[in-house]
UniProtKB/Swiss-Prot annotation:
GO terms for molecular function: glutamyl-tRNA reductase activity; NADP binding. The active site is at C50. Keywords: Chlorophyll biosynthesis, NADP, Oxidoreductase, Porphyrin biosynthesis. This is Glutamyl-tRNA reductase. Possesses an unusual extended V-shaped dimeric structure with each monomer consisting of three distinct domains arranged along a curved 'spinal' alpha-helix. The N-terminal catalytic domain specifically recognizes the glutamate moiety of the substrate. The second domain is the NADPH-binding domain, and the third C-terminal domain is responsible for dimerization.
């Protein structure tokens, strides 16, 4: 009845080890189906992302423990030269449940509250379910984890506030202008940072986005993705600066892309209508003296990182609330696990009494009418329900320090003379 979690993540191993041990979707399917078909596991699932590769396994035999699974994965990836068992963590029983609840609720992420991980856990479960590798335990474990994540998102602020430079820039623009749908945006640079900023802008309802890049085709590709199809040649974009309410720069350069003189002329043409410049470049893309101009709001990476740090601090203050939700769900999950342990005894107990009832009724089958026999059957059913109520309730009750599930099971089986159940997961 054990659930083992074994894996590497950003806390236990450097990126080169995480890259070496990660599994593609094809490898994921091959790995978990191999565990099942070889008789090593009843159930298996793998969560594999850039920051973690984690196995969740219900062993089929005693020999399948944490150390076995570490070696099994290392061997599967042919990574014995690079990867060592000490790069792994191991969790068991409720420790496994706690871990996946923390992962799904984004408090085990590299960036606290980063919500992308929930989708990755859901994808891992989808793969396990589609390959018939997710049985009753992993299915319940995952659905409880999804429920935990939903409660954490709705009842805490752990995922609120920008914690990336590009998203912080967009949030700042929204705070200043409120309605971005009415604003015209210029993106200078179509690299990874610029692309993220543009997509965040689009999510905040900014639709009038114009893109310029040294390589025009790259700007055109991003514009097509956003559905704007609005680009400017890099050589001439400065002629249009006055048209924009928000300017985002994210380009690799040793010289300033925008200087004070250019922006001064732009502001004259704009009749001093406010402009936000979000400088996401490193080195900086915009001359700091631009901030001296009237109605010109310039924010660079350092200013945005200050916002990010404050948001991370706010998220950290939500951790006690998140942990309280996890603890509550852990108790419920543990109680459910306990019901699985007592289920065979409950079934055997009910079966024995039903068998006794049917034998006794059979003795009267030809001595009474069919109508009377049915009344007797209904009566004995009610009696059996009342007789079995207390022992079943006792088996299902939460455990405390004075007893255990095995002791309860043994007591009931001895009192009612039940045969030992067949061992299965």
């Amino acid at each position: 009845m054990n659930i083992i979690s074994v894996g590497v993540n950003h806390k236990t191993a450097p990126i080169e080890i995480r890259e070496r041990i990660s599994l593609s979707e094809v490898q994921n399917k091959e790995f978990i189906t191999g565990l099942i078909s070889s008789g090593l596991a009843h159930e298996a699932m793998v969560v594999s992302t850039c920051n973690r590769t984690e196995l969740y396994v219900v062993p089929a035999i005693y020999e399948v423990n944490g150390e076995f699974l570490k070696e099994y994965l290392i061997s599967f990836k042919d990574a014995r030269k690079e990867v060592r068992p000490e790069h792994f963590f191991s969790r068991f029983y409720c420790g496994t449940a706690r871990h996946i609840f923390e992962v799904a609720s984004a408090i085990d992420s590299l960036v606290l509250g980063e919500g992308q991980i929930l989708g990755q856990v859901k994808n891992a479960y989808r793969i396990a379910a589609e390959t018939q590798c997710a049985g009753i335990l992993i299915t319940r474990l995952c659905h409880t984890a999804f429920s935990v994540a939903k409660k954490v998102k709705t009842k805490t602020k752990i995922m609120e506030g920008a914690v990336s430079v590009s998203y912080a820039a967009v949030e700042l623009a929204q705070k200043i202008f409120s309605n971005l749908s009415m604003k015209k945006v210029l993106l200078v640079g179509a690299g990874e940072t610029g692309e993220l900023a543009a997509k965040h802008m689009f999510q905040k309802n900014a639709r009038n986005i114009v893109i310029t890049n040294r390589t025009l085709s790259k700007a055109e590709t991003l514009a097509e993705e956003l559905g704007t199809n609005k680009v400017l040649p890099f050589e001439t974009f400065r002629e249009h600066l006055h048209e924009f309410d928000i300017i985002i720069t994210a380009i690799s350069t040793k010289e300033y892309v925008l200087n004070e003189a250019e922006m001064h002329q732009s502001m004259i043409k704009r009749r001093l209508k406010p402009v936000i410049i979000l400088d996401l470049g490193l080195p900086r893309n915009v001359d700091p003296d631009v901030s001296k101009l009237q109605n010109m709001f310039l924010k660079d990476i350092d200013a945005l990182k200050h916002i990010i740090d404050k948001n991370l601090e706010k998220r950290s203050r939500e951790l006690p609330k998140v942990n309280a939700i996890i603890e509550e769900e852990l108790i419920a999950f543990g109680q459910w696990i306990n019901t699985l342990k007592v289920r065979p005894t409950i079934v055997d107990l009910q079966s024995k009494f039903i068998e006794i009832k049917e034998k006794e009724l059979e003795r009267y089958r030809y001595k009474v009418s069919e109508e009377e026999l049915q009344r007797m059957e209904h009566l004995t059913d009610r009696i059996l329900k009342k007789i079995l109520h207390h022992p079943i309730k006792m088996l299902k009750a939460p455990i405390d320090t004075t007893d255990s599930i095995p002791s309860r099971v043994n007591l009931v089986r001895n009192v009612f003379d039940l045969e030992e159940p067949n061992q299965s997961h």
